[in-house]
């Protein structure tokens, strides 16, 4: 009986993180193979066509996160842990403006004229106050093809969005702004995640 129970237990809850079960899903008529344990929304944890899939991965391992620990009275006062995850969303774009085109044609209308060079080829340009992106900054490394739109640190830490289009779907990655101090590593991680999600079933 114990063996039967083990075999019937959902694979996303028991598969080792080093080799998670993968689900073939179609988003925007584009095939992706996603680790079941990385799917954040239970109703999205199935194969076949979907409008959107929301995922999370630990960084820098890029493995699905472990199941959250149950919070009790003895743990609720513990210090909040730093974010160590990349959140990813795959959504059908329905022929909306591509992310790279938005960077070229939309964002410049709302950016300040001056830019600030940062470490290792990264540039920062602030969005003007009173615009749709007021209170945010655009980070770009043109030679590396890296762009991220980020909120600023306030009551909560700033977060960044990096987007890319894959055929009929847009991938949106979210990660802490503080990670930009090692932006090349983050950019490489996003490239690897994209390749993994587009990889063959296995």
Give the ranges of each region predicted by the language model:
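Hydrophobic membrane-insertion alpha-helices, especially the h-region
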Residues: 1-10
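Extended hydrophobic
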Residues: 156-172
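Surface-exposed amphipathic alpha-helical segments
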Residues: 168-202
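A mature extracytoplasmic/lumenal domain signature
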Residues: 38, 152, 175-177
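Non-cytosolic head/periplasmic domains of membrane-anchored proteins
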Residues: 75-159
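Alpha-helical transmembrane signal-anchor/signal-peptide segments
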Residues: 11-28
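Extracytoplasmic/periplasmic/luminal assembly and interaction segments
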Residues: 33-91
């Amino acid at each position: 009986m114990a063996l039967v129970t083990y075999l019937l237990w959902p694979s996303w809850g028991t598969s080792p993180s080093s080799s998670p079960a993968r689900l073939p899903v179609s988003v925007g008529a584009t095939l992706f193979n996603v680790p079941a344990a990385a799917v954040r929304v239970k109703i999205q944890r199935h194969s076949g066509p979907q409008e959107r899939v929301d995922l999370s991965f630990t960084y820098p391992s890029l493995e699905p996160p472990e199941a959250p620990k149950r919070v009790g009275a003895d743990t609720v006062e513990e210090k909040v842990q730093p974010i160590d995850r990349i959140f990813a969303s795959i959504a059908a774009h329905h022929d909306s403006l591509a992310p790279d085109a938005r960077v070229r044609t939309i964002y410049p209308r709302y950016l300040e004229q001056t830019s600030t060079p940062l470490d290792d080829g990264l540039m920062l340009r602030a969005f003007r106050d009173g615009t749709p992106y007021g209170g945010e900054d655009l980070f770009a490394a043109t030679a590396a093809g890296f762009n991220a739109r980020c909120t600023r640190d306030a009551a909560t830490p700033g977060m960044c969005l990096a987007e890319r289009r894959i055929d009929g779907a847009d991938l949106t990655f979210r990660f802490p702004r503080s990670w930009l101090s090692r932006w090349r590593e983050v950019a490489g991680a996003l490239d690897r995640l994209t390749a993994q999600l587009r990889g063959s079933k296995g």
